[in-house]
Amino acid sequence: MAQMYFYYSAMNAGKSTTLLQSSFNYRERGMRPVIFTAAIDDRFGTGKVSSRIGLEEDAELYNKSDDLWSKLSMMHADTHIDCVLIDECQFLTKEQVYQLTEVVDKLHIPVLCYGLRSDFRGELFDGSRYLLSWADKLVELKTICHCGRKANMVIRQDEAGHAIADGDQVEIGGNDRYVSVCRKHYKEALGR
């Protein structure tokens, strides 16, 4: 039975690496996975999922206005899809998460979503909020803070490396702008 999975974590826990390994596993068995990534995330170029360890694979792009149900049902009608892999799923809209549940429930295709749970303010992204509510399986991928504890928060830094508490929820950046830390060091960095 197909299910929807949400693999979530702070930054630098290996979400994209895990997605690419899943894609490889499907292809190794002669199956066809389809990978999507957010068009807004162009850190490593467009139309690619890339991991920090050097793996990468081409991906379909999605943006907030895309109807993923229509897109995937047409793709599936053209050539059978065995699995849908979504990178940067925190950028999905509520409606897109619902559309992905339709892919699972009506087309019987597993959907594996990988993304951040919360932003630099400690607030849920919309995509993450609805995946936490509607996914069949929730899987936390772990990374570590500089102190050795589990990192479950993300700090956004300015150019001088100081923690920022305000700003737009979405600002694309990598290790130069964001650091994963434990809750204790998150609060300390923000002076709370």
Swiss-Prot record:
The keyword Lyase does not apply. One of its GO terms (cellular component) is cytosol. Its EC number is 2.7.1.21. It catalyses: thymidine + ATP = dTMP + ADP + H(+). Keywords: ATP-binding, Cytoplasm, DNA synthesis, Kinase, Metal-binding, Nucleotide-binding, Transferase, Zinc. Pfam families: TK. It is an enzyme of class 2 (transferase). Gene3D superfamilies: 3.30.60.20, P-loop containing nucleotide triphosphate hydrolases (3.40.50.300). GO terms for molecular function: ATP binding; thymidine kinase activity; zinc ion binding. It is found in: Cytoplasm. ATP binds at S9, A10, M11, N12, A13, G14, K15, S16, D87, E88, C89, Q90. InterPro entries: P-loop_NTPase (IPR027417), Thymidine_kinase (IPR001267), Thymidine_kinase_CS (IPR020633). Zn(2+) binds at C145, C147, C182, H185. Its main location: cytoplasm. One of its GO terms (biological process) is DNA biosynthetic process. The keyword Nucleotide-binding applies. The active site is at E88 (proton acceptor). HAMAP family: Thymidine_kinase (MF_00124). NCBIfam families: PRK04296.1-5 (NF003300). Homotetramer. Belongs to the thymidine kinase family. This is Thymidine kinase. The gene is tdk.
